[in-house]
Design a protein with these regions (language model features):
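N-terminal accessory beta-strand-rich subdomains and adjacent acidic, glycine-rich linkers
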Residues: 1-147
Length: 147
């Protein structure tokens, strides 16, 4: 099932450069069902400068949690894209076995497609598509019920 809507919201924050912000976007919700029940949604929001998506997983009966066994979300960038990335370190390493602790160094203008130290990269990730601009890939969460 597909549901589309237009988002037009205004909010205020006291501690940012522009305290009153108007957010306009289009939203599409793709629902995935099994045996007539919605299992999860993939929700996309697209605005003039942003693309965002999230997964919403629905409780099944009395079960209020789930196990994600594999994550296959990915991003593809054009050939020649360079990066400004922080490699993810192996877990339980470094000082007092506190890794990953976001204290590794960012590498500038590396070619896209490498895999850091074999563990991927830490968000946020910044990609440069030559003279065509930059792409920031990051993560955020807004509620416990949204994965």
């Amino acid at each position: 099932m597909l549901f589309r809507s237009k988002i037009d919201e205004t909010y205020e924050l006291a501690s940012i450069k522009q305290s009153k912000v108007r957010y306009v976007a289009n939203e599409a919700v793709f629902s995935f069902t099994q045996q007539g029940k919605t299992i999860y949604d993939v929700i996309f929001r697209i605005s003039n400068n942003d693309v965002a998506f999230k997964y919403k997983i629905y409780p099944q009966g009395e079960t209020l949690s789930c196990v994600v066994k594999q994550e296959v979300t990915g991003f593809a960038f054009p050939d020649g894209t360079t990066t400004f990335l922080c490699p993810q370190s192996k877990p339980m390493g470094g000082f007092a076995r506190t890794s990953p602790s976001y204290e590794t160094s960012y590498t500038a203008d590396d070619v896209a497609g490498k895999n850091g130290w074999g563990e991927g990269y830490t968000f946020p990730c910044l990609f440069r598509n030559g003279d065509n601009g930059w792409v920031l890939v990051s993560e955020t969460g807004d509620r416990k019920s949204v994965v």
